[in-house]
């Protein structure tokens, strides 16, 4: 089996620019014995699954005949295979990475009659964050060159912060909603979102603007495989380096 090449999500998406058609199912509700809860415990928890498969060629015949044929993937079967793979996983606990790969394998098997260009699986835990909307992992894989992407994220974490350098701005903390992505994530760090949220909260309590800007970097760096650039022009998001 060819060695997987880990890429930044934005770079991986550039490689998929020539993909013509995609089939996606979003927010499939399951209870998964995967990841960790807000207390860091390995217990079953609700999860929302989003699976997207990319085709190297347009499904013209299916569109012209208004029928699901061998040129495309039936989204109903794609949904059922993703949910079934989680239900059949058994009582053994899975890391978020293992769960994402399990679902990716099920999606690939469901589309066995179609040549897939890529598959992306997003595992989102609505109860995976104490102060935010949740946490999750996005796992992307291209089958042609075996390139992959792993992104750990926190969504809408609400923290009070001292913002600004003027004296009147430092009299009271202001509510801030922060979302955080960690790209090029190491495989064994896909369940560290609780630790990352704790780091984010700790930094937000600092009264120093420079600390708020830079203190997270040395904490998050060990979670990744290699450094990142500051700015992703494709996604228009800041990334820690």
Language model region names:
Residues 2-241:
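N-terminal, polar/charged subdomain of small-to-medium soluble alpha/beta proteins
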């Amino acid at each position: 089996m060819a060695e997987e090449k880990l890429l930044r999500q934005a770079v991986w998406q550039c490689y998929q620019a020539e993909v013509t058609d995609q089939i996606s199912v979003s927010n499939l509700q399951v209870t998964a014995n995967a990841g960790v809860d807000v207390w860091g415990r390995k217990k079953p928890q609700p999860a929302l699954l989003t699976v997207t498969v990319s085709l190297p060629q347009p499904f013209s015949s299916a569109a012209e005949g208004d029928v699901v044929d061998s040129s495309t993937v039936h989204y109903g079967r794609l949904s059922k295979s993703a949910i079934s793979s989680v239900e059949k996983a058994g009582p053994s606990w899975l890391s978020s990475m293992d769960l994402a790969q399990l679902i990716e394998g099920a999606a690939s098997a469901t589309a066995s009659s179609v040549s897939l260009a890529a598959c992306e699986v997003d595992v989102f835990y609505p109860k995976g964050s104490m102060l935010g909307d949740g946490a999750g992992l996005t796992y992307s894989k291209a089958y042609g060159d075996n390139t992959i992407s792993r992104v750990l994220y926190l969504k809408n974490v609400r923290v009070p912060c001292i913002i600004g350098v003027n004296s009147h701005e430092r009299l009271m903390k202001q509510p801030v909603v922060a979302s955080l992505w960690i790209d090029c994530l190491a495989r064994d760090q896909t369940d560290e979102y609780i630790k990352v949220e704790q780091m984010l909260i700790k930094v937000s309590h600092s009264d120093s603007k420079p600390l708020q800007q830079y203190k997270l970097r040395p904490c998050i760096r060990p979670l990744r495989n290699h450094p990142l650039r500051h700015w992703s022009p494709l996604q228009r998001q800041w990334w820690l380096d």
